[in-house]
């Protein structure tokens, strides 16, 4: 059967790894061929002996619709009249060894509900977007001078319907968007909603890189969710997984009977920790598949950024491997040179084609220049998760306050590297699962001390340099560990103590937006000065946040990490005059004891801590206060 030809130019760009709209070429696309409506199918399978399309339109008969191959590029294609949106399909492949295998479409844009895995022919381009103003503003987004506060969400467990089922994308839009707007976050980060077979993987074992999971609705339902976020001035970041993929036999693994997407040598092609396969980043068509996926989400779903998962596992050939279990690169080193080039290309292409999007790296090592331009040897990300800050801060707060003085360096060490990258401070899903306990349950002491310590943690995060990220449930003190099987413990919000925690996060988000000192210069040392980092005996730290502009004043931050109030605590300040307390994590409004500084603090001409003036204040137990010059 004659097929509408794929252009030589399309195939040439794909073979070079530079076709940035490959999602309009490969896969299944509704077309009109010589006056006949139908669907054109195209798939890359260069080592196959034969490929045919099977589906519910031909009774899954592999003898009905054989595809033709362009031998120069290994792309098989076929036009089938009468196949419409909603029809199910797969590819029946005969390998060069004569084996018969069935695969779903790597470029499929919708799939059946799991455990079924056929792709679904979809019609794209009819959703009526209403976010034009948002996209126009995003093009001018100066993220380095703006507040970035991210609410990390697993869509299947944020909240359930009354019957216990998941909320749909549209129901999430109607419930999650107002909640996030009220709580004050600037962005929602969705754990992977790319299609995946296993609920327990949380989406991190992706099989459909061009399709939103059907668990929560249709592709247009997800577009509605993003659209509603944008119309309420909330950005959407997609958690995206280019580091590995599952070895399910219906998907990418040995797609045409050979190691096509993965590296054929298991010393480079198999991830030992996760039992998954690793992409062959040196292959042009594989790089194009992945970069095309990233662009697909930014283009057709208007995503505002990608959080790239497990970057460290991509960068190191010896990641989680013993001697003899890995192959060195061409120079004898452990760096994955192909993955480095892939990440540089990914960031360069995404940021040039979609100005204002955020590319975030979850990179857990000290790999240099993750957030520096490729032109100077960097990977080109905008932001990197600060895993060191997270580990040190949680380790410190898990100590009994009596012993925190011996771990004071956990608070101070991070400032030695805080501006070496553009950092996000992540209190993510990874910290509240697998026996790690919830954030509030990590805190020692009785219930009051646990809540005070959690308020202190959030206050410290919002006053510390860097973008912010908080996993759902933390904002109101979820006590159970997170599980993808159940919704959050929303009943806790009937109690004033948990209402207070959420009010605290609301107000911290408000302060973060309102005061330039907290969000400008967050990625440069100009925005931070220690006042006193040496008071380990009392477990108190104090520092300045500077906005870098004369029209906006600095903020003074003082934090007490013990349950002992610090009365008449003297700190140096940069100017004389009156200072005003604008925030106190111990306020009764948040469930605290209301110990603080209700009156103006008069700076005295007493030099202190290399500052020309000083003030005496009360620092509440397990509390943090913010001061600003009184006007």
From Swiss-Prot:
Enzyme Commission number: 2.4.1.18
Gene Ontology terms: cellular component: cytosol
Pathway membership, UniProt: Glycan biosynthesis; glycogen biosynthesis
Keyword Glycosyltransferase: yes
UniProt-listed InterPro entries: A-amylase/branching_C, Branching_enzy, GlgB, GlgB_N_E_set_prok, Glyco_hydro_13_cat_dom, Glyco_hydro_13_N, Glyco_hydro_b, Glycoside_hydrolase_SF
Residues of the active site: 309, 362
Alphabetical keyword list: Carbohydrate metabolism, Glycogen biosynthesis, Glycogen metabolism, Glycosyltransferase, Transferase
Catalytic reaction(s) noted: Transfers a segment of a (1->4)-alpha-D-glucan chain to a primary hydroxy group in a similar glucan chain
GO BP term, example: glycogen biosynthetic process
SMART domains given in the database record: Aamy
GO molecular function: 1,4-alpha-glucan branching enzyme activity; cation binding; hydrolase activity, hydrolyzing O-glycosyl compounds
Family the entry assigns: Belongs to the glycosyl hydrolase 13 family. GlgB subfamily.
Subunit composition and interactions: Monomer.
Known function: Catalyzes the formation of the alpha-1,6-glucosidic linkages in glycogen by scission of a 1,4-alpha-linked oligosaccharide from growing alpha-1,4-glucan chains and the subsequent attachment of the oligosaccharide to the alpha-1,6 position.
Protein name, as recorded: 1,4-alpha-glucan branching enzyme GlgB
Species for this entry: Marinobacter nauticus (strain ATCC 700491 / DSM 11845 / VT8)
Chain's gene name: glgB
């Amino acid at each position: 059967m004659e097929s509408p030809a794929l252009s030589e130019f399309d195939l040439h760009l794909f073979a070079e790894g530079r076709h940035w709209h490959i999602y309009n070429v490969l896969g299944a696309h509704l077309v009109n061929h010589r006056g006949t409506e139908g669907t054109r199918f195209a798939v890359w399978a260069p080592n196959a002996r034969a490929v045919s399309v099977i589906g519910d339109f031909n009774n899954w008969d592999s003898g009905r619709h054989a595809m033709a191959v362009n031998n120069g590029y290994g792309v098989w294609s076929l036009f089938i009249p009468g196949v419409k949106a909603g029809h199910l399909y797969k590819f029946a492949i005969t390998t060069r060894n004569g084996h018969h295998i069935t695969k779903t479409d790597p470029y499929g844009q919708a799939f059946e509900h799991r455990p079924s895995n056929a792709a679904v022919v979809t019609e794209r381009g009819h959703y009526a977007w209403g976010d034009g103003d948002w996209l126009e503003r995003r093009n001018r987004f100066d993220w380095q001078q703006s507040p970035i506060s991210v609410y990390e969400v697993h869509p299947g467990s944020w909240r359930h319907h009354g019957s216990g089922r998941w909320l749909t994308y549209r129901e999430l839009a109607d419930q999650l968007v107002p909640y996030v707007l009220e709580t004050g976050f600037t962005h929602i980060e969705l754990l992977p909603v790319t299609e995946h077979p296993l609920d327990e993987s949380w989406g991190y074992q992706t099989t459909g890189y061009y399709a939103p999971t059907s668990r929560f609705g249709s592709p247009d339902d997800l577009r509605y969710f993003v659209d509603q976020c944008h119309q309420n001035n909330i950005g959407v970041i997609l958690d995206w997984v280019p580091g590995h993929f599952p070895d399910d036999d219906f998907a990418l693994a040995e797609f045409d009977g050979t190691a096509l997407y993965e590296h054929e040598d298991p010393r480079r092609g198999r991830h030992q920790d996760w039992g998954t396969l690793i992409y062959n980043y040196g292959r042009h068509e594989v790089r194009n598949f992945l970069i095309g996926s990233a662009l697909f989400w930014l283009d057709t779903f208007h995503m505002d950024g990608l959080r790239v998962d497990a970057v460290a596992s991509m960068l190191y050939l010896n990641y989680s491997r013993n001697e003899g279990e890995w192959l060195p690169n061409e120079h004898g080193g452990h760096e994955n040179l192909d993955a480095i080039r892939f990440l540089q290309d990914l960031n360069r292409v995404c940021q040039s084609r979609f100005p204002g999007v955020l590319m975030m790296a979850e990179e857990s090592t000290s790999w240099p220049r993750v957030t520096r331009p490729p032109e100077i040897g960097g990977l080109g990300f905008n932001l990197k998760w600060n895993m060191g800050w997270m580990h040190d801060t949680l380790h410190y707060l898990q100590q009994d306050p009596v012993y925190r003085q011996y771990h004071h360096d956990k608070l101070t060490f991070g400032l030695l590297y805080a501006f070496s990258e553009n950092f996000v401070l992540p209190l993510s899903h990874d910290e509240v699962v697998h026996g790690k306990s919830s954030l509030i349950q990590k805190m020692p002491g009785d219930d009051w001390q646990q809540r005070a310590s959690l308020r202190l943690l959030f206050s410290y995060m919002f006053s510390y340099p860097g973008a912010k990220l908080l996993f759902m449930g933390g904002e109101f003190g979820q006590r159970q560990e997170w599980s993808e099987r159940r919704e959050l413990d929303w009943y806790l919000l009937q109690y004033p103590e948990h209402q207070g925690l959420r009010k605290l996060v609301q107000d911290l988000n408000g302060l973060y937006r309102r005061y330039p000192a907290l969000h400008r210069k967050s990625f440069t040392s100009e925005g931070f000065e220690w006042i006193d980092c040496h008071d380990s005996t009392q477990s108190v730290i104090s520092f300045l946040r500077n906005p870098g502009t004369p029209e906006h004043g600095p903020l003074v931050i003082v934090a007490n990490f013990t349950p002992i109030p610090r009365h008449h605590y003297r700190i140096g300040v940069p100017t004389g005059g009156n200072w005003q307390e604008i925030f106190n994590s111990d306020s009764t409004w948040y469930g605290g004891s209301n110990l603080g500084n209700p009156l103006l603090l008069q700076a005295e001409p007493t030099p202190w801590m290399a500052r020309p003036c000083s003030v005496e204040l009360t620092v509440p137990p397990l509390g943090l206060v913010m001061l600003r010059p009184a006007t």
